[in-house]
Amino acid sequence: MVDTTRLTRAVDHFADRLRAAPQSRLQRNGAAEALALARELARRAQLLEAPGVEPREMPDAGMFAAADQITVAVHDLALVLVDEGQVADAVRLVEEAQKRAGV
């Protein structure tokens, strides 16, 4: 089993920043970036769990749910990652999304 602590910490930090962000920041780009990240993390988890099956898209639950969506998606992904390269790639995605979100 691979250590995913770096990944879950990165997402927890991003989620905390989203929860603390003003509504105006979420509306500008914070929530959209978080949703895009959650969808990508969920897609990757589904592809690892069921190769060859078309992944389902995570629904948009609204800007105030964005932090929860990335948290759920990363925990699902963390359960199926098999090597450090996958963890590092996912951490990079989280860090880039947080920068674009401006939080």
Question: What is each model feature region?
Answer:
Residues 20-27, 47-54, 103:
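Intrinsically disordered or highly flexible coil/loop and linker segments, enriched in small
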Residues 4, 23-34, 56-63, 80-87:
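Alpha-helical rod/repeat scaffolding segments in eukaryotic adaptors/tethers
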Residues 46-82:
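Amphipathic protein-protein interaction modules
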Residues 68-103:
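Amphipathic alpha-helical binding modules
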Residues 1-42, 94, 98-100:
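Short terminal alpha-helical segments
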